[in-house]
Amino acid sequence: MERPAPLAVLPFSDPAHALSLLRGLSQLRAERKFLDVTLEAAGGRDFPAHRAVLAAASPYFRAMFAGQLRESRAERVRLHGVPPDMLQLLLDFSYTGRVAVSGDNAEPLLRAADLLQFPAVKEACGAFLQQQLDLANCLDMQDFAEAFSCSGLASAAQRFILRHVGELGAEQLERLPLARLLRYLRDDGLCVPKEEAAYQLALRWVRADPPRRAPHWPQLLEAVRLPFVRRFYLLAHVEAEPLVARCPPCLRLLREARDFQAARYDRHDRGPCPRMRPRPSTGLAEILVLVGGCDQDCDELVTVDCYNPQTGQWRYLAEFPDHLGGGYSIVALGNDIYVTGGSDGSRLYDCVWRYNSSVNEWTEVAPMLKAREYHSSSVLDGLLYVVAADSTERYDHATDSWEALQPMTYPMDNCSTTACRGRLYAIGSLAGKETMVIQCYDPDTDLWSLVNCGQLPPWSFAPKTVTLNGLMYFVRDDSAEVDVYNPTKDEWDKIPSMNQVHVGGSLAVLGGKLYVSGGYDNTFELSDVVEAYDPETRAWSVVGRLPEPTFWHGSVSIFRQFMPQTPAGGRGFELNSGSNDVDAGYHRLPQNPEELH
């Protein structure tokens, strides 16, 4: 039997070597052997040490001893501003890798570790101080953390303050610097039960020192999310506040809030704006609502499902009360959803159904002037427009009435519409032809015109279209390609393709992103995929799944009340119980015309 060949190399590693080396160095220090430098702390106390150990433990000492400074050769080095007991702890850490952080030494030790560049000790002190945060010290702790660039502690203090803002004393809040208060008001995590509380916080701060702080009021009011302050409070308190009434920028913010609540503000057409995003603590969330469609067996669905992107969960809403049929159109007007027209295969519908999100109920409203199917509907300046090949009409929810408008100059088959920059755009093929065109409606003149926007993309069918941040997005129904048109610059662009095709799927805008759902995929299988496009990253991602594979459904986004998302341990903002400023009622956006006018 042959013996194995001897190894040319035997790799060996002693896992205990590092610890053994530290112990050996500590022993040499205790025996005062090979010491080559003495550190002099504040008060004149001496600490003999080894240069090599200090340089290996701290970039501060490495730079000191390796450079051309006098200290690189000196036998004694004076350290200004370092308490002896803190230097003792840091030296012990250099030789052992251990330090005991306590309530008595955490802050001075962090200061010394920051000065002498012991990042691990500094981080340990910050972690300890995070556990000591309370109502009495959280504001000072945030100041301390930011002064010493302790990001973990600063972030923890910020979260604690936002979570417990309602429990902080009036004196604590009123002495906040402007920049700090603005940071809190702008943060999604500010824990208030209603946005009125954020307004009161800003107003209380200004009233604590009106002569010096009143000039900052427009900045503060801009950080408050006025669109989600209830209408009666806007009228009774915000509009009546002298600081608002005498300030044009504040009046513009107030007008914006009222337009939003009256459904005259298209948040999708504008650029990203934090004021149009409710705080999670208020329980209000922007959701994706799916209406109707067909399942894998081509059976008609009357279910209405909503998807909350904050939780990733689906919930049922009130079912559609009637037979939807086919060829209907769905649109969101303010915080309500409207379903118009359609047919049962033999009869066209002129009926219009409205979903009231505040009471989770469908009701029938005034019928259209003309029954129709395979039309398109969009909202422009708070009015609902219905566009078909041979007619256009407009609905005013305040008066529950329809008005006939000029039809398109060139009739189009199966067009899709979107509102952008104060105009209504219709995209489709000319009736009886394959030529694709875009027409534009001007509500001021009640006239349609052909849009000369150069060579259109090679669409086989009218694409689904929505507006986001002043751009019109066209999602093709027979491919994963997506085109973009900028009407202001008259420019075309193409964004990355979707992960799959969505033939017969649905398109909506939610939270500043495009959401495409359902339809048939590349393999002609009915899909339940929901994917979203983020304009900031220019990327598509799968964000969820439909309750079941669906096609020919409609989707829109609205705001709806859910259970408030209050972080654990946070009570949120407690309003003065003696004040009539805010009631404890159900927080919702105004829904009914009588509430809006």
Swiss-Prot record:
Which GO cellular component terms are attached?
Cul3-RING ubiquitin ligase complex; cytoplasm; polar microtubule
A single Gene Ontology MF term assigned here is: ubiquitin-protein transferase activity
Transport keyword on record? no
Which InterPro entries does this one have? BACK (IPR011705), BTB-kelch_protein (IPR017096), BTB/POZ_dom (IPR000210), BTB/POZ_KLHL21 (IPR030577), Kelch-typ_b-propeller (IPR015915), Kelch_1 (IPR006652), KLHL21_BACK (IPR047069), SKP1/BTB/POZ_sf (IPR011333)
| Disordered: annotated span | 570-597
Give every BACK domain span. 138-239
In its keyword annotation, does this UniProt entry include Chloroplast? Answer: no
CDD domains for this protein:
BACK_KLHL21, BTB_POZ_KLHL21
Q: State the UniProt keywords alphabetically.
A: Cell cycle, Cell division, Cytoplasm, Cytoskeleton, Kelch repeat, Mitosis, Repeat, Ubl conjugation pathway
List the subcellular locations.
Cytoplasm, Cytoskeleton, Spindle
Give GO terms for biological process.
cell division; chromosome passenger complex localization to spindle midzone; protein ubiquitination; regulation of cytokinesis
Which pathway does the UniProt entry assign to this protein?
Protein modification; protein ubiquitination
Q: What is its main location?
A: cytoplasm
Q: Which domain of life is it from?
A: Eukaryota
Any idea where the BTB domain is?
Answer: 35-103
Q: Where are the Kelch repeats?
A: 287-335, 336-382, 384-422, 423-470, 472-512, 513-560
Question: How does this chain assemble?
Answer: Component of the BCR(KLHL21) E3 ubiquitin ligase complex, at least composed of CUL3, KLHL21 and RBX1.
Role summary:
Substrate-specific adapter of a BCR (BTB-CUL3-RBX1) E3 ubiquitin-protein ligase complex required for efficient chromosome alignment and cytokinesis. The BCR(KLHL21) E3 ubiquitin ligase complex regulates localization of the chromosomal passenger complex (CPC) from chromosomes to the spindle midzone in anaphase and mediates the ubiquitination of AURKB. Ubiquitination of AURKB by BCR(KLHL21) E3 ubiquitin ligase complex may not lead to its degradation by the proteasome.
Instruction: Return the protein name.
Output: Kelch-like protein 21
Source organism per entry reads Mus musculus
State the gene name recorded for this protein: Klhl21
